[in-house]
Design a protein with these regions (language model features):
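Transmembrane beta-barrel domains of bacterial outer-membrane proteins
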Residues: 100-109
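Surface-exposed loop/turn motifs in large extracellular/passenger domains
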Residues: 80-95, 110-128, 139-160, 169-187, ...
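Disordered, low-complexity segments in secreted/periplasmic proteins that are enriched in proline
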Residues: 32-77
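Feature marking well-ordered beta-strand scaffolds used for ligand recognition
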Residues: 74, 133-135
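C-terminal segment of classical bacterial N-terminal signal peptides
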Residues: 22-32
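Bacterial Sec-dependent N-terminal signal peptides
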Residues: 1-18
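Cys/His-rich zinc-coordinating modules
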Residues: 417
């Protein structure tokens, strides 16, 4: 994930960019994380498939979320250290009190196919990580670390006061951690709550997660993807770039409450997903939900996916509820309350990632049994599609500045659009055929005659004044 977590990482990035400026070459692969035992080598920057933006590093660090693939190398599982190590064995432990104080040392490490059951224990961590990549990708310096092993955790209290000290970290496709009744509090930077990489999995329930540092998402995945599945969570993050959820893998949250006072609600990067159900989450900075691709190598190229059902999402910033850049993305909403300070529902545009003039977005928003409000915008190299399905009602304008490369809308018979400003659509489809479920409110919706041959260039009067007319 892209945000650079430490001063060392900023220095490394600055050097890399200086080389790029003077030589035209970005020394990207020279500082990737080394693979941990049983894990693939860290991905290098990929060429995107046809139809997606070409990637190049921007002149600055990526935005809110997680840090990226510049910096020192990671370590193999055999090189990692901890106050307590279970190495290829099966153990059941209870009532431990462990305090790891040395740099790069975890409190508890299970590795090499080990299996541990740990209950009723307190683990704490001080002492910074010496390598951002090692802590971000292979879990160095985490409070509890599972590397290609299994762990069952219950009734634990985990605290850290160090940079690069994630709480529970699962790395490797053979790593699975189950956790129940866990309390987590991390105080410094790059110290997330639950974090998985390289196909690792965490399944957690009844978790209480507080993070205070920068780049400390409560629920996270990093390089090589990972899976984090959580039920019943209480989340509080306060640092810059520390959303409630940051995914370069697959993250599911059911029955959760949370606030990110220094960041967005949630971020998906690349071909990855966030699935929310019965949650109440609030973000305070920049946007509500961010869907993007940085091309740092941490997230595969493809469609970013976000869904929320039976939930409440509150965006306290003045930015859009959905911000999409440099990727193809889809969001699906059902019976979810959206609360926001600003007047923009969606903005699909170019940002600081990707290649100039090829770094727009392509976004589809699907809504069922849903109330939506706000304008939908896209720039001249971006496409946006709104699908209003049964019992979806939207009050807003589509492409009111007539800037989008494409702006499309479809409505089922039981959907409705309350138009708030003149709008310009590329294609429009409506099950009613007479567009009686579009309330014009005196505004004109212009459609592309060439892209809507079935409308034959006709003008249709809309309810409450206004019209649908060819352009």
């Amino acid at each position: 994930m892209k945000l650079i977590h430490s001063i060392k990482k900023h220095h490394t990035l600055a050097i890399a960019l200086a080389i790029a400026v003077t030589t035209g070459f970005i020394p990207y692969g020279t500082s990737q994380a080394a693979s941990a035992a049983g894990q693939p080598q860290a991905m290098t920057m990929q060429a995107p498939p046809d139809g997606t933006p070409n990637g190049e590093l921007p002149p600055g660090p990526p935005p809110d979320g997680m840090p990226g693939g510049h910096g020192q190398s990671g370590k193999s599982a055999s090189e990692l250290t901890a106050s307590q190590v279970v190495d290829g064995q099966t153990q059941s432990l209870t009532g431990l009190t462990l305090n790891a104080t040395a740099a790069d040392q975890s409190a508890f490490l299970v590795r090499n196919g080990g299996s541990v059951t740990l209950t009723g224990s307190t683990l704490s961590k001080t002492g910074d990580s010496s390598s951002a990549d090692a802590s971000n990708f292979s879990g160095q310096n985490a409070i509890f670390l599972s590397s290609n092993s299994t762990a069952s955790l219950s009734n634990l209290n985990l605290t850290s006061n160090a940079d690069g000290a994630n709480a529970i970290f699962s790395t490797g496709k053979n790593s699975t951690v189950t956790a129940d009744h866990i309390k987590i509090h991390t105080k410094n930077n790059s110290s997330r709550g639950l974090d998985s990489t390289y196909g690792g999995t965490i399944q957690a329930s009844n978790v209480d997660i507080t993070t205070e540092g920068a780049h400390c998402a409560a629920l996270a995945t990093d390089r090589g993807e990972g899976n984090v599945i959580v039920k019943d969570a209480r989340i509080a993050t306060s640092g810059d770039g520390s959303p409630c959820v940051y995914s370069t893998g697959n993250i599911q949250l059911t029955n959760g409450q949370g606030e990110a006072t220094g960041s967005e609600i949630a971020v998906v990067e690349g071909k990855n997903s966030i699935t929310l159900q019965k949650v109440d989450l609030t973000g305070y900075k920049k946007h509500g939900i961010m869907l993007y691709q940085s091309f740092s190598g941490d997230a595969s190229v493809g469609q970013a996916t976000f869904s929320a059902k039976d939930s409440k999402l509150t965006n306290k910033s003045d930015g859009p509820m959905f911000y999409i850049t440099n990727t193809k993305a889809t969001a699906t909403l059902e019976n979810t309350q959206l609360v926001q300070n600003g007047d923009t529902l969606v903005n699909v545009t170019s940002g600081q990632w990707g290649k100039t003039d090829k770094n727009g977005g392509n976004f589809t928003l699907n809504a069922t049994n849903q109330t939506l409000k706000g304008k939908i915008l896209a720039n001249n190299i971006s496409q946006v599609t709104l699908n209003l399905k049964d019992h979806a009602v939207w009050t807003g304008s589509l492409n009111e500045d007539y800037a989008a490369d494409q702006a499309n809308i479809s409505l089922t018979r039981q959907a409705a659009w309350n138009v708030t400003s003149d709008s310009y659509v590329t294609t429009i489809t409506d099950e009613t055929k007479d567009f009686s479920n579009i309330i014009g409110n005196g505004h004109t919706v212009y459609y592309s005659k060439a892209d809507n041959p079935s409308l034959q260039g006709k003008t249709f009067n809309l309810r409450n004044g206004g019209k649908l007319a060819a352009k």
